[in-house]
Amino acid sequence: MPNVRVRSITLSPLLPLVKDYYVQRAQVPGTLLITEGTLVAPKASGIPALPEIWTEEQISAWTEIVDGVHAQGSYIYMQIAAFGRQASPDYLKSRDSTFPHVGPSALPHAPGAPIPREMTKEEINEHIEFFGIGAANAVHKAGFDGVEIHGANGFLVDQFLQSTSNVRDDEYGGSVQERVKFPLEVIERVVKEVGADRVGIRLSPWNRSAGMGMEDPIPTFSYLTTRVKELYPDFAFIHVVKARVDGFTDLLPEDIKEFETNDFIRNIWAPKPLISAGGYTRESGMETADEKGDLIAYGRWFISNPDLVTRLEKNIPFSKYDRSTFYIPGDASGVGYTDYAFAQ
């Protein structure tokens, strides 16, 4: 986890089965769950049926989910996110006719996609504040153990980092230091609200989807990692996505260049906690944990195996997942969501 599941009703409290989904996967005490990307403000949204964390109704619904996870003796972080240029302009207008479609620069996330307007400095500051408020709502009101800033997969923080989406000529774009400025200010604002030991960030240096895939991400992500380590000795973790995962697609080994690894982040960040995600099996996960000391995140396998932790411990084969049921916006049936079987 985290995995986008689009089962939430955007303008109403979360569906009750969302609680079942998380509680099912928290049944082994000590499990750490990270929610799917949860939007920090209406202006930061982008498509229907994603979870949100700004109204009292939403906070109350999340509190019930958090309490259910904690009752199992497990932990849960909220991944907080903003869409930026990936948002649907029509969806934003359907929520409020004044909501703009914006990004770091006036560049679309894909050929033929709508072109966002370049964010003003006022809008940049506004989004930084959104992240701070979202973190406070999650930790201080809903009771989450911490938050993970979504800085991966072409969402807003990632858009500022990458030269393919950020060609600004002010202090928020251009050099490595300038492209890292917005992510660092988001981190600073979130840390101010909840403390560094309750904050992590997810990064995908090698992701090519959603118009990402800068030619050489190593200098940018090295600088970000170094600065976070220097500024926040108690920062909870960095969560990296392997090069083999490209958005929602798995690349073939021959499509991945030899240098496309996250070892550069791992080496800078050591000995602090690093979470690694990217289609791990039981065997490859254990091998990476043993050889590199990473914490291993499981996403898709956790969808189809609510008792994944037990299966990992006892070497029980994984149940296969059904991709066709990954994303069913607003569905309340539980199909492909809460109906996967536990091993006997």
Labelled PLM ranges:
Residues 1-344:
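Flavin-dependent oxidoreductase catalytic cores
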